[in-house]
C-alpha cells in the first residue's frame, strides 16, 4: 500500500503499489546508470535516490517491522520475473487481509555471483537470480491464519517458476 504521506499524490495514497530500493557499492556513475535503466523501464510515481550510510539503509524499514507483529513467510529463488509469475502475483496479491503483508524480490547478481557455489555459508546456487520473499505481517494474532493462507497460496503459485536448487524457506 502506498502510504498516506505528503510525497505521495493524494489520488494514489492507500492504493496498491511497489517500491524499488536500489543498493550498490560501485561508483556513483555505475549507480546512476542502474537508476536510469530502471526509471526508463518503469517510470516511478515518486522518485528519491540519495547516497546514504549502510547503517541508515539497514534502519530504513525498522518502523514497518516493529516488535509485536505476527508474521509468516515463505520464499524461493526465481531466475526471471516472467509474465506467468507476474500474472500469479497480480491474481493473488489483492487477497491479502493485512496492509503490512508484502512480496519482496531481491536481485542477486554481481558480487553475489563471483564466489564458487560451495565457497560460502549461504546456500543455493550463485547464478544471477531473484530471492523472492512472501511475508504475511499482522498486527493482531487473529489475522494470522488468513495471511498464512495468502502466503502459502502465492508460494504454491510461484513454485513452477522457482529454480530447482535449494529454496529459501
PLM region spans:
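Soluble FAD-dependent oxygen oxidases
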Residues: 1-169
Amino acid at each position: 500500500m502506498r502510504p498516506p504521506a505528503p510525497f505521495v499524490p493524494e489520488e494514489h495514497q492507500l492504493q496498491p503499489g511497489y517500491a524499488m530500493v536500489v543498493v550498490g557499492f560501485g561508483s556513483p556513475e555505475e549507480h546512476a546508470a542502474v537508476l536510469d535503466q530502471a526509471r526508463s523501464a518503469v517510470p516511478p510515481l515518486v522518485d528519491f535516490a540519495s547516497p546514504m550510510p549502510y547503517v541508515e539503509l539497514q534502519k530504513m524499514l525498522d518502523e514497518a517491522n516493529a516488535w509485536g507483529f505476527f508474521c509468516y513467510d515463505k520464499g524461493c529463488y526465481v531466475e526471471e520475473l516472467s509474465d506467468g509469475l507476474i500474472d500469479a502475483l497480480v491474481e493473488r496479491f489483492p487477497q491479502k487481509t493485512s496492509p503490512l503483508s508484502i512480496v519482496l524480490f531481491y536481485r542477486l547478481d554481481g558480487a553475489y555471483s563471483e564466489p564458487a557455489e560451495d565457497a560460502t555459508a549461504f546456500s543455493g546456487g550463485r547464478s544471477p537470480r531473484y530471492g523472492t520473499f512472501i511475508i504475511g505481517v499482522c498486527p493482531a494474532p487473529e489475522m494470522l491464519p488468513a495471511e498464512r493462507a495468502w502466503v502459502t497460496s502465492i508460494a504454491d503459485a510461484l513454485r513452477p517458476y522457482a529454480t530447482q536448487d535449494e529454496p529459501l524457506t
